[in-house]
């Protein structure tokens, strides 16, 4: 068992219900993610010290972040499961692998990730149907909290916890679906989900 990285955890969780049901156009996925300075790892570096990061916002590794292949790999698996179940919306044989545009940003907070993903669907779907889809997909998943209405996840509300908060919106003017995910990169994005996986492997309560 391998735990995914912090960015992939957010991206996969926020897009999994759409991908697993074959709703997303795989060539339309854009992800804009923001992480606190602890997301850069344990090694000290000048850009991550408080005087450098304070009152600053910077995009980095644009189009070449190491987590892009991991996100595409897992979304591909979700798409292919749907194909094997009988959908014709996507086939691995056709070479129609999902390709994402991913841009991470460093923000002046110690911990936390806020990921906003944009995608287009094969067919127009009412937002109430999409909310129902997410509720059904994550039914019984105690560490997933779904926001409905106009509220949006905030990393502050998951700090120190193993939760991933998700929200889903539809831009009727453009036809795009927007999902927002918030998690603590040091817990749900790292040690917390490792413990969660261990509990499942050992038969303990999750």
Model regions and ranges:
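C-terminal substrate-binding/catalytic lobe of Rossmann-fold NAD(P)-dependent oxidoreductases
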Residues: 27-30, 37-86, 90-179
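Basic phosphate/pyrophosphate-binding loop/patch that engages nucleotide-derived ligands
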Residues: 16-25
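NAD(P)-dependent Rossmann-like dehydrogenase/reductase catalytic/cofactor-binding core
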Residues: 163-165, 170-206
């Amino acid at each position: 068992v391998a735990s995914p990285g912090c960015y992939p955890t957010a991206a996969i969780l926020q897009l999994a219900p759409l991908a697993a049901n074959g709703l997303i156009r795989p060539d339309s996925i854009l992800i804009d993610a923001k992480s606190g300075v602890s997301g850069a790892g344990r090694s000290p570096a000048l850009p991550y010290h408080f005087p450098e990061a304070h009152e600053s916002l910077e995009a980095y590794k644009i189009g070449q972040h190491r987590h892009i292949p991991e996100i595409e790999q897992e979304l591909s698996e979700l798409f292919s499961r749907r194909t094997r179940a009988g959908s014709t919306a996507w086939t691995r044989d056709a070479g129609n692998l999902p390709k994402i545009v991913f841009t991470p940003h460093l923000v002046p907070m110690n911990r936390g990730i806020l990921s906003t993903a944009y995608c287009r669907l094969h067919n127009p779907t009412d937002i109430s149907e999409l909310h129902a889809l997410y509720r059904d997909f994550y039914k019984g998943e105690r560490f997933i909290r779904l926001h409905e209405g106009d509220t949006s996840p905030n990393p502050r509300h998951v700090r120190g916890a193993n939760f991933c908060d998700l929200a889903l919106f539809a831009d009727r003017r453009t036809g795009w679906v927007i999902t927002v995910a918030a998690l603590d990169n040091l817990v749900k994005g790292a040690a917390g989900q490792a413990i969660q996986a261990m509990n499942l492997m050992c038969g303990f309560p999750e």
